């Protein structure tokens, strides 16, 4: 948590001196600091800085003081004098208020821009804030709300197109073609049309009247030409808007086209389905983060179906059909208390470092992953080590750096499995427990994995599976043989016991893909994608007859090491597989390439194809299935291995540009259907 001008422990009078020295404040700007403290915080500058610097934890603030601090910090930020980082504001202070009171009015209203000189008018359209997500699970919850709304309106959720854009960190405004307004409180804003009169241009040669957007400045230009005059880009933007007479550096920035108004409708974007969004989430976020040469503080995702937008509507604070993903880059330096081993479902023993309790990203952190025991050994991570850790929406943060390692004698490298006590063996960087048949951790984790991959069962999470194991259950066939009375005997209530039996029956009766069923057994290097590849060459029940040589020679994309791991894993699950297979699971077979010779004869056999955009003749999912049946491999993102990009309606510029750069064939939906003779 840093004050923009430097040391957070500076006395209040020196704080003002530093700011005024940097940008030569006008009288109005000097008054702003005093006005904010009097009107918003109601306490002295020293207290404000103590909170911002971390000398006073938000945990120990009254709700009234916490609210006052948020209001003061927001007002200073909007005026161009940020008191602390975006991450600290969002992940520490705002998160603490949300933890105490999720329905607090401050969280449900638009964060207003400071009142400025100029005509205040009704905005042509409400400018709301954007709801925020800090991890993938929050994005998933947002998606479930959209899916529910789509079902109620009779819309196929899988056909919806989602859009992602960079979230600009500039000065929000609305351009109606005649005037430019600040966002204000979302309903009324200040007329700042003189910014255009001063030469401000719309980005990319765009026209006026494109609605909401932000005034931003090129990052490289700011660093090279403006950093000596302004603490940060917000400060520059505020000066451009509010000053009666512009300073020469501001005029030059406008003339150079470094400062522009960027309408949201002109932002570079990603477009795709919900499944693509989840599968490529990190790639999409990182790609959009690099798309514009301006400061951004997140990525905005939204649906583009206007009818569904209208149905979902908005709160007083944000549109329900839109959400902003924000990454937290806060780092804390902590002391390691101990390193505790944990055994995974595949027998890998992972080190988890327990650290002194530290609040990071608004959460109290006590554990951080150390990845593998080679890292513990080589980097000296043990009791007393000092590490720097970060947390970006993950449950367990990660180690960024070992500041002070400990000696080898202080390291605790386990020799035995923490779950079953068996000897551990090194395999590369990892320690493994080889007792996969009776290790409690491997048994329970494997059960959880089975139901998670099936995806059609509720009620078999970690606590339920652990209770079943403690009640004597050690394998899945025995679980499927249980009746309601058996569940009650191990501690489940009558209603829950009945539900468990119903869920098990449901898992067998609902149709699922055969490759998903095989993937649920958790064979190393045999995830859902590889299972589907295998089953395009051999039927499910015959997969256990494959040799390493066959896999490498006959199936595209498998190397010797992978083939060896797969064959060894299949041998290990063979008996269990056929016990469950005999229970009559309803499985949809994967089309064989050799079946009727269709795949071998098709013009796309052996090709890697990516489908993008909304398809007209069939759903994208159906077209992908059909392509696989014709011998193609379907990808989700453009890579050097992609042979063909098939485009539907409303295609994102990102995939098109990447395909063109890599020289990949681009076909319209109609051209593709003619190629494979679907029309």
UniProtKB/Swiss-Prot annotation:
It is an enzyme of class 6 (ligase). InterPro entries: BRCT_dom (IPR001357), BRCT_dom_sf (IPR036420), DNA_ligase (IPR001679), DNAligase_adenylation (IPR013839), DNAligase_N (IPR013840), NA-bd_OB-fold (IPR012340), NAD_DNA_ligase_OB (IPR004150), RuvA_2-like (IPR010994). It comes from the Bacteria. It catalyses: NAD(+) + (deoxyribonucleotide)n-3'-hydroxyl + 5'-phospho-(deoxyribonucleotide)m = (deoxyribonucleotide)n+m + AMP + beta-nicotinamide D-nucleotide. Keywords: DNA damage, DNA repair, DNA replication, Ligase, Magnesium, Manganese, Metal-binding, NAD, Zinc. Residues 599-679 form the BRCT domain. NAD(+) binds at residues 86-90, 129-130, 183, 214, 326. GO terms for biological process: DNA repair; DNA replication. GO terms for molecular function: DNA ligase (NAD+) activity; metal ion binding. The active site is at residue 167. Its EC number is 6.5.1.2. Zn(2+) binds at residues 417, 420, 433, 439. Its cofactor is Mg(2+); Mn(2+). Belongs to the NAD-dependent DNA ligase family. LigA subfamily. DNA ligase that catalyzes the formation of phosphodiester linkages between 5'-phosphoryl and 3'-hydroxyl groups in double-stranded DNA using NAD as a coenzyme and as the energy source for the reaction. It is essential for DNA replication and repair of damaged DNA. This is DNA ligase. It comes from Desulfotalea psychrophila (strain LSv54 / DSM 12343). The gene is ligA.
